[in-house]
Structures are given as structure tokens and as C-alpha cells.
Amino acid sequence: IFKNIKYLDPTLILWRSSSQWIGGLFFLFFLIIIFSNKSFNYKMTNLSFSGESNTNSKENIKDNLLRVLFIYSVLSIFILTLLNISGIRLFNSLNMSMTLVSGGGFLPSDSIEKIISNNFQKIILIFSLLISMLNFYLLFNLFNKKTLVKEHQEDLYLIILSIIFCMLIYFYDYKGLDIVLSVVSSLANSGLTLIKSDNNLSLYFLLITIIGGSLISNTSGIKLTRFYILLKITSLEIIKLISPNSVINKTIFNSDRKISEDNIKISFLIFISFFLSLLILSSLLVVDNIGFEKSFKLSILTLTNTVNSEMYNMHNINFTNL
């Protein structure tokens, strides 16, 4: 909606990025409390690493949240320092660090090209967005090799998936780091990109955006774990039809965790709810005369909480007229 952001009051820009930072922190608080406390009986708690023990007591919950706050703050300061060292002015570095650690797409400038100008800065962006899309507990267990290998298969699959998505468009006429940044940004539901709007990959990036990141992360989307469950159960049903005597393996990501009937039901429910919401929202926007393609893209970006950017070919939409 705003044009010429540089003319806005700096305190307003700082408030916008800091509110995003706080929102990301409280969203992590909510996820970790729900996932780590088995008494809530949330249907997906057994599919993603959510701490070593059940946080039933107030003391354990408090300790867990303090650890999250500490790591979240240290990570923000670390990204701020890297951005500042790379040559980005302090004000932009501060706003960008709060945006990146929360997996957002807010910019303190009209264009990301005015902030990011070299490969080192691009690598920092990729690293920051990668961290925001992975399981936040990965940072807890970074130096615990046994837990890292055993409990974070979901994160490994996300990294492998990112590499595959990058390889699929490697031969397009784009710089390598720009491709990686756009793919990771889409998975992290951020929307930050250095790819211009005259690309033919907008639908490709939208599909990646729908997938999202880890269950315990600041990302939106349907989530990779739920897609994995749907694909695996579908393939198992086909195998059962072909070979009824086959031994069915219902483990997820080749771990010790097994997919339960409740996991399957909730995954299908979320999948159907997402596309039903997409249909309803697209229909409402089409009535507003913005065209089917734009309404479809805007609906996906809205449902996945992703910032509109040039890689989705939506640069010419005027939000003030909606």
C-alpha cells in the first residue's frame, strides 16, 4: 500500500519490523507449548521433535520458553551483526534481522535491490530464511549429534527438497544464489526475492509456498510433514491393492515415529480446508474484478501469510484499490 517507504517516519518502519519479530516469537511460544505438552493431545505432537521431556509443570514450561527467547534473541543479534558487517547500514540491518528471524517479508526500503548488493549478503539472507523454516529445536540440538541425526529427519528432508527445487530451475537464466534465495524464501513463506517479475516460474514458486516448512517453525502453508503423510498413505493404499500381503511400513521420514489414524485424518482435514478456503477467497476476489489469475495467486499468498513479490508476477497489483 505504501509507496516511497524512505519517506516514512523511521520509528514507524521500526515498529512494523519489531511487531513482526514479537509476533514470530509468540507464535513459536504457542507452537512449543502445544507440541511439547502431551496433555493437550494435539494430533501431530508425535511427528516432530518437540523437546526431550513433557513440559507438564510450570517450571519446565518457563525454562523452555526462556530458552526459546534466549536463542531467538541471540539469533537476531547474530543476523544483525552479519548484515552490518556485510555493508548494510545499521537501520536496514536492524529491520532486516527482525524480519528474517521471524520468517517475514517486510522491507525497510522500496526494493530489496537497494539493500542487497553482493553475494555475501545473499548468503546471509539464505541462511536466515533457512533457519526460520526448519524446526526451531534444531538450534537447541545443534551440538548434540545423536539427537540431531535421530530426531531431525524432517529438517533433512526440507533441505534436500530445497536442493531439488533449486536444481529443477538451475538452467534458467538466473544467478545461482538468486534461485536458492527464491526457493528458500518460498518454503519459508517470506516472499523475499531478487528475481524479476518477467519470469515464467510464478506458479512454480506458488506451489513451493503452499508446502511451507517444519511443523515447529514460523512458516505457514500446509507443511511438508502433512504432504509426506498424504503421499505415503496414498502410495500404501495403492500397494495394498496391488499386493495385499505386503508388509506396510507407516513410519515417517524413516524414523521410529509411526503415522496414526488421527495423523491421517487431521492431515486430510487441513489439506481439504486449505483448498476450500482458497476456492472461497478466490471467488470473492474475482467478484472484485482483479482477474482470476491475480485472485488465485493473491489467495495463496494470503492463506500462507506470504508477502507479495516480483517472483509471483504480481508487481502491478494496486492494493489501495482492493
Predicted regions: what is each one?
Residues 1-322:
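Membrane-proximal intracellular helices of multi-pass ion channels
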